[in-house]
């Protein structure tokens, strides 16, 4: 961290030191390969000398038996805990009193006061007062740690100085989301696909990836059982892992009221790096684009997947009134020009008056003429009051054999 001192006097009796606390790393092993069946034994002898010099008993492992302290100021990532040790040292030959230390962390949007217990302390010559402070980083970008010290000299003079320590905070993961609305599902289910990419320069192990839904939805995680178990949760730098969630309406009796809801919930993630450092992130509220159903919505409730050619089959449909007024609806069937499927049901049938947020069921008899995968099209719903026609094509596909 780069420091920038600022003081009210050039001659200070106290000195301020700040040190970031980070976990050590495993020391790498400079392995020496040799032929274990060398009849001369020279390779084994040379490998033994290398082990004697390096103090490592095993040369066949990628990491050693010893830990090393960080050799440089490593990156700080969003969601991690920033821990540092702040120490006030009396470098003079006099005792100072009323020593108070204040630590603040300033970002581009706010200034946070960090808890510090060094208050009204008395520090004798060559003595010190310090404290370990931890803070969860919640913003990316430039951060400034501001440490201010107030104290009194033996002559009763009030002294003050402060130091600034600047460091950047990067984003450890990148989250991309996609929403899929099951418009043919009467339950108004919504599927969320989340792609998580490790944008840091270190390996991470995903401990938890959960969706915290809004009050309007219940969530189910659609997780694939990885044949490698927890190995699938290990993300190397630039690795991407996908997660899928299904959200169903909490109020199953009023599913049509969910068509305009856009707030889905928040994605909650936690992970650990190679030495066990923990990180946690929660996204902002996820928003989806509400599907445009119009005033009416048609769904296929029941239909066979395969049928025999020239053998009629039945398709069960359900029509929803998504508007805020009652609709007087009429069903009309248009025979397709290709004549692969032919409607056998009467056209121009009245479906009656449909109140808001209600539905009506009806069935269609269809005669398959041509083999292959055929689409059901040509269903027309007419609002007899406004004379508006709602066209429904390709509502289902049938395999004709």
UniProtKB/Swiss-Prot annotation:
Q: Which domain of life is it from?
A: Eukaryota
Cite a single Pfam family from the UniProt record.
TRAPPC13_M
Report the GO terms under cellular component.
TRAPPIII protein complex
Q: Which family does it belong to?
A: Belongs to the TRAPPC13 family.
What protein is this chain from? Probable trafficking protein particle complex subunit 13 homolog
**What species is this protein from?**
Caenorhabditis elegans
């Amino acid at each position: 961290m780069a420091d920038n001192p600022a003081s009210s006097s050039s001659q200070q009796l106290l000195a301020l030191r700040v040190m970031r606390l980070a976990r050590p790393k495993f020391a790498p092993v400079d392995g020496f390969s040799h032929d274990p069946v060398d009849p001369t034994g020279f390779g084994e002898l040379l490998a033994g000398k290398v082990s004697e010099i390096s103090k490592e008993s095993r040369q066949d492992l990628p990491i050693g038996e010893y830990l090393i302290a960080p050799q440089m100021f490593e990156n700080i990532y969003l969601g991690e805990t920033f821990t540092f040790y702040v120490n006030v040292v009396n470098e003079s030959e006099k005792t100072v009193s009323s020593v108070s230390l204040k630590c603040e962390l300033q970002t581009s949007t706010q200034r946070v006061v960090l808890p510090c217990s060094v208050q009204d302390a008395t520090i004798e010559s060559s003595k010190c007062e310090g404290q370990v402070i931890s803070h969860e980083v919640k913003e990316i970008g430039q951060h400034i740690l501001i440490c201010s010290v107030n104290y009194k000299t033996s002559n009763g003079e009030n002294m003050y100085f402060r130091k600034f320590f600047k460091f950047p905070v990067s984003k450890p993961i990148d989250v991309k989301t996609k929403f899929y609305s099951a418009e043919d599902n009467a339950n108004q289910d919504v599927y969320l696909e989340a792609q998580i990419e490790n944008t840091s320069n270190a390996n991470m192990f995903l401990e938890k990836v959960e969706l915290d839904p809004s009050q309007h939805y219940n969530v189910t995680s659609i997780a694939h059982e990885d044949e490698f178990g927890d190995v699938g949760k290990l993300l190397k730098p630039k690795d991407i892992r996908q997660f899928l969630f299904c959200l169903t309406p909490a109020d199953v009796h009023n599913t049509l009221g969910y068509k305009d809801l856009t707030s889905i919930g928040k994605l909650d993630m936690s992970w650990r790096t190679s030495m066990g450092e923990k990180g946690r992130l929660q996204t902002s509220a996820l928003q989806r684009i509400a599907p445009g159903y119009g005033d009416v919505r048609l769904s296929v409730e029941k239909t066979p997947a395969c049928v025999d050619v020239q053998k009629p089959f039945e398709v069960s449909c359900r029509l929803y009134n998504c508007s805020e007024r009652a609709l007087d609806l009429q069903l009309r069937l248009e025979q397709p020009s290709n004549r692969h499927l032919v409607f056998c049901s009467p056209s121009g049938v009245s479906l009656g008056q449909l109140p808001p947020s209600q539905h009506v069921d009806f069935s269609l008899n269809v005669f398959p003429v041509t083999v292959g995968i055929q689409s059901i099209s040509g269903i027309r719903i007419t609002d007899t009051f406004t004379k508006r026609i709602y066209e429904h094509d390709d509502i289902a596909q049938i395999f004709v054999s």
